[in-house]
Design a protein with these regions (language model features):
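Conserved SAM-binding loop
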Residues: 52, 77, 98, 192, ...
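N-terminal "arm"/small-domain region of PLP-dependent enzymes with the aminotransferase-like
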Residues: 1-27, 225-227, 354
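Short beta-strand-to-turn element immediately C-terminal to the catalytic PLP-Schiff-base lysine
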Residues: 176-177, 190-195, 244
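Structural detector of well-ordered beta-strand residues that form the stable sheet scaffold
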Residues: 51, 76, 97, 150-151, ...
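PLP-dependent aminotransferase-like
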Residues: 65-154, 161
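PLP-dependent aminotransferase class I/II
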Residues: 35-39, 44-50, 111, 115, ...
Length: 377
């Protein structure tokens, strides 16, 4: 079976984990490897501050805390996303306002955002689906006009850009994931990027269980104490050590994944021309990171048959999000506003193909062969 995903591994990770435990004697949070990873993110993506977290979910939770939401405040987000995007803001007492996506990028529709803004709206959460950027100029203009915060859900967007700017660095906050399913992994982990300097100190406090420990470690106070709400969002330095090996090889991983993405896209171009499938769309002003490669089949039944055919042929393919507004918690904590033109339709038709670092040319060719065979090619 050709697996849908294989966690990335470049070969240096375990040596760095060993160094963390045996040489540095630092396996709790905020150790040397954590600092290396954070500096790398800040330097490579021109971020004001990057803080590693225990997950992409906890990065979103930190962003939600920084937004200072009150019960009943509204947060606008796409329904076509993972539950973490929603739960982070629900925990702050927010009401979720789900809106439709665009048919090309599968990202949140800026016009749909503008249409649902009320006096209770506080935050916009653009989700960069498949590592392809949302229309951030439009979204930021809307946010500025209505004095709203923007928290980018960029879990899939590490190494992607919008008009030359790294995803996660455009809004007030950006949230990355380094889960094993992502392009760069620490097993479980993430990062929050703070792009507005006014929030940097408080972000450190929230991450350090509500204490000003970071100020103490910098010698800015003679002792640290509890000053605000927060939680324990620091990952082990052993996890950061694992991630460091991959950040050192970030371009190699990127190039490898892009080779597979382009091989798929070239191989299926004729299927799209014949109307048998739809291919991913990447606008010219955006650079994506090959986080995933998906096809859209004509109907839900077609997709079900397609996934079954691939499985029988030794290829694991997966559908993706079920719209959050149709889930029990989605109905409880929010509602869909406007017309659902594309969200449910895309959810029912989209299927993702195997794509991971180190995928062999032979396996890539086999996936292409099986997909084309399904269509009699």
């Amino acid at each position: 079976m050709i697996n849908f995903n294989v966690p990335p591994y470049v070969g240096t990770e375990m040596e760095y984990v060993r160094q963390s435990a045996e040489d540095n004697h630092k396996i709790c949070g905020d150790g040397p490897f954590t600092k290396r990873c954070q500096s790398w993110l800040e330097e490579h993506f021109d971020a004001e501050k990057a803080l590693l977290t225990t997950s992409g979910t906890s990065a979103l939770e930190m962003a939600a805390m920084l937004c200072d939401l009150e019960p009943g405040d509204e947060v606008i987000l796409p329904s076509f996303t993972f539950s973490s995007t929603a739960t982070a803001f629900v925990q702050m007492g927010a009401r979720l306002v789900f809106v439709d996506i665009l048919p090309d990028t599968k990202n949140i529709d800026p016009a749909a955002i503008e249409a649902v803004i009320t006096e209770k709206t506080r935050v916009i959460v653009p989700v960069h689906y498949a590592g392809v950027a949302c229309d951030m100029d439009e979204i930021m203009a809307i946010a500025q006009a209505h004095d709203l915060l923007v928290a980018e859900a960029a879990a899939q967007g590490v190494m992607s850009t919008y008009k030359g700017k790294a995803l996660g660095t455009i809004g007030d906050f950006g949230c990355y994931s380094f889960h094993e399913t992502k392009n760069y992994s620490m097993g479980e982990g993430g990062a929050v990027l703070i792009n507005n300097p006014a929030y940097c100190e408080r972000a450190e406090i929230i991450r350090e269980k509500g204490t000003n420990r970071s100020n103490f470690l910098r010698g800015q106070v003679d002792k640290y104490t509890w000053v605000d709400k927060g939680s324990s969002y620091l990952p082990s330095d052993m996890n950061a050590a694992y991630l460091w090996g991959q950040l050192e090889a970030a371009q190699t991983i990127y190039d490898d994944r892009m080779a597979t993405w382009h091989a798929y896209n070239d191989a299926f171009a004729d299927l799209a021309e014949e109307g048998l499938v739809e291919l991913p769309v990447v606008p010219d002003d955006r650079v994506q990171n090959a986080h995933m490669y998906y096809l859209l089949l004509p109907t839900l039944e077609d997709r079900t048959n397609f996934i079954s055919f691939l499985k029988e042929s030794g290829v694991q393919a997966c559908f993706h999000y079920v719209p959050l507004h149709s889930a029990p918690a989605g109905e409880r904590f929010g509602s869909f506003h406007g017309e659902d033109v594309y969200t449910t339709e895309v959810s029912e038709r989209l299927v993702r193909l195997p794509l991971y670092y180190g995928m062999s040319v032979a396996d890539r060719a086999r996936v292409i062969e099986v997909v084309r065979a399904y269509f009699g090619r």
